[in-house]
A protein has these predicted regions:
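Structured catalytic-domain cores with a bias toward divalent-metal coordination
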Residues: 1-321
Length: 321
């Protein structure tokens, strides 16, 4: 299922060569701040002593998705990338400008809607261009780490591309609590990699600008399971899963029928029954109380943590096995 024509005998990134048994930190200069400070994207390359697959681990494509950044940073600090076979390319923080501005986008542009990018386009487009130009030709598959946005908390989950057998296989190996197929989005990183026949799975866990220890640990454990499966690292006892991933076949958003103050009565990731009360919406004077009920038997995939809502706002993302 996975190609045996491995690419890690010698990788060339930014005119630097990384041979078998070598590890390097390569910095791609992106732009300067108005103060003249140079902004560089640090890329860590860990090439094992033996031929094997090359995997890209990418965090911070959206600058405010701190869990994605923290879990890759923590793996660096804990020296989890002791690679024996194959190569791991790690980008803990791609969207540095968004990170500095505490925002999802880069100068108003969504990097994940800017692929394949342009050498002379917007800053987001240029970042996408250099990522595709410098890295993708070296990669066999990738894990793209994200969190929920807009104060929506995603229960740890893996998303893969429909009808992509290799993506589905990777999702099963990762073994997050929840998994499901998700349609490709035009100009996204996953879509562009799909065009280049590179499978990408997306890990979602927690919400933007908030560290979530459970989401971080699930992301680390799933990543180690993938590395172990391909014999890139030695066995590590603590990566054994305590759960089997639940495969969801249908998903939908439960939206607010009225405006008001919202309170959830179920926890994220919990099993739910059709007709079960998931939360309540009251007006600011306590005169009305609208019960939010589940339309399906299934699980809570994501939960809105913002208390002030308007009609039509998403409250829960729910899925059916």
């Amino acid at each position: 299922m996975f190609d045996k024509g491995f690419k890690n005998e010698e990788l060339v990134i930014r005119n630097e060569r990384v041979r078998l048994g070598e590890s390097k930190l390569i910095k791609i200069p992106l732009d300067r701040l108005a103060t003249g400070t140079l902004i560089e994207i640090p890329i860590y390359i860990f090439n094992g002593n033996e031929l094997g697959p090359t995997i890209l681990l990418q965090g911070g494509l959206h600058g405010d998705e701190t869990n994605s950044i923290e879990l890759l940073r923590r793996m660096l600090i804990d020296k989890r990338y002791k690679i024996q076979k194959g190569c791991v390319i790690v980008i803990p923080l791609l969207n540095i400008f968004g990170f500095l501005d505490l925002t999802r986008n880069m100068n108003g542009k969504d990097v994940n809607r800017s692929f394949p990018g342009s050498k002379s386009g917007s800053l987001a487009s240029r970042m996408a261009y250099y990522l595709m130009k410098e890295l993708i030709q070296n990669v066999d598959f990738a894990i793209d780490f994200h969190t929920g946005g807009g104060q929506r908390n995603n229960y740890p989950q893996i998303r893969y591309t429909p009808r992509d057998d290799r993506g589905l296989a990777l999702a099963k190996i990762f073994n997050a609590p929840l998994m499901f197929s998700s349609k490709l989005i035009s100009k996204s990183f996953r879509n562009e990699c799909h065009k280049n026949h590179i499978p990408v799975i997306v890990y979602e866990g927690g919400e933007s600008l908030r560290l979530d220890e459970y989401a971080i640990q699930e992301g680390i454990s799933g990543t180690l399971r993938v590395l172990k499966y391909f014999e890139m690292i030695a066995y590590i006892p603590e990566i054994k899963a305590e759960h089997k991933s639940i495969h969801l076949n249908k998903r939908k958003w439960v939206r607010a029928k009225v405006a008001g103050l919202f309170t959830a009565t179920v926890t994220n990731g919990s099993p739910i029954k059709k007709g079960q009360i998931l939360g309540n919406i009251v007006d600011t004077y306590g005169k009305t109380n609208d019960q939010v009920k589940s339309p399906v038997d299934g699980y809570v995939i994501a939960k809105n943590n913002f208390p002030i809502i308007n009609m039509g706002d998403p409250l829960f993302h729910v899925g059916e096995p």
